C-alpha cells in the first residue's frame, strides 16, 4: 500500500492524495467516488479480480479475487486506510479535482487538509442513496469538524456541495482555480 510505504520513506515529507483524469468516457474528473456498488457483496466490498491491463475482471461480486480476499481477510479495509492516514507522521493533503462522493467524501474528511478546485470539485455523501453506512472514521471526524447537526445533514440528505459551500462550512482549507 502506497500510504504505508510513504510513512516509512525519510525523503517524503508530505503525502498528496488526488484523483485521476480526465475520464475517457466524458472528459470529467473525479477525486474518488467511493466503493463500486457493482462489486458489493453480502459481506461488503470485495477485492475484484484484476486483468493484465489493471482493469477489474467483471462488473459484479462474482469476480472476487478469492486468493487476495483470503490473504486480506475478505473485504476491503477502508478503516485501515483511514487509520493509516490519521496516524501518518507526515501531513496528508487531499487535492479534490472533481467528485468526492461516498467513501471519497469520507477520505477527504480524514485527511489533514483539503484543497479543492473551485470549478470542478463536488462533494456528496451517498450512504443514504445506496443503503450503506460509513464503515470508517468519516462520520465521526465530520461531526467533530462541523458539528452533529451539520454532519447529519451531510450524511442523511445526500445533497451535493460545491467547493465554495464546503469552504464556508469549514471542510476545506481553500478552493482554488485549476491551472
Features from the language model and the residues they span:
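Conserved small/polar residues in nucleotide/adenosyl-binding loops
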Residues: 1-5, 173-178
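Conserved CoA-thioester-binding segment of acyl-CoA-metabolizing enzymes
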Residues: 1-22
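Hydrophobic/aromatic residues within transmembrane alpha-helices
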Residues: 17, 36, 107-108, 166
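Glycine- (often His-adjacent) and acidic-residue-rich active-site loop
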Residues: 19-81, 131
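CoA-thioester-processing core
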Residues: 81-87, 95, 101-155, 169
Amino acid at each position: 500500500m502506497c500510504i504505508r510505504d510513504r510513512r516509512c520513506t525519510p525523503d517524503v515529507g508530505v503525502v498528496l492524495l488526488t484523483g485521476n483524469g480526465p475520464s475517457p468516457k466524458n472528459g470529467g474528473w473525479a477525486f474518488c467516488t467511493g466503493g463500486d456498488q457493482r462489486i458489493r457483496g453480502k459481506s461488503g466490498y470485495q477485492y475484484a479480480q484484476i486483468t493484465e491491463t489493471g482493469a477489474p475482471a467483471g462488473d459484479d461480486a462474482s469476480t472476487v479475487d478469492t486468493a487476495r480476499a483470503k490473504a486480506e481477510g475478505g473485504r476491503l479495509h477502508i478503516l485501515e486506510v483511514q487509520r493509516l492516514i490519521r496516524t501518518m507522521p507526515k501531513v496528508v493533503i487531499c487535492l479534490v479535482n472533481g467528485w468526492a462522493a461516498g467513501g471519497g467524501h469520507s477520505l477527504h474528511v480524514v485527511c489533514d487538509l483539503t484543497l479543492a478546485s473551485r470549478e470542478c470539485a463536488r462533494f456528496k455523501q451517498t450512504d443514504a442513496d445506496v443503503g450503506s453506512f460509513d464503515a470508517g472514521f468519516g462520520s465521526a471526524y465530520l461531526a467533530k469538524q462541523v458539528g452533529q447537526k451539520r454532519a447529519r445533514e451531510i450524511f442523511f440528505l445526500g445533497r451535493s456541495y460545491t467547493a465554495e459551500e464546503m469552504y464556508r462550512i469549514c471542510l476545506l482549507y481553500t478552493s482554488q482555480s485549476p491551472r
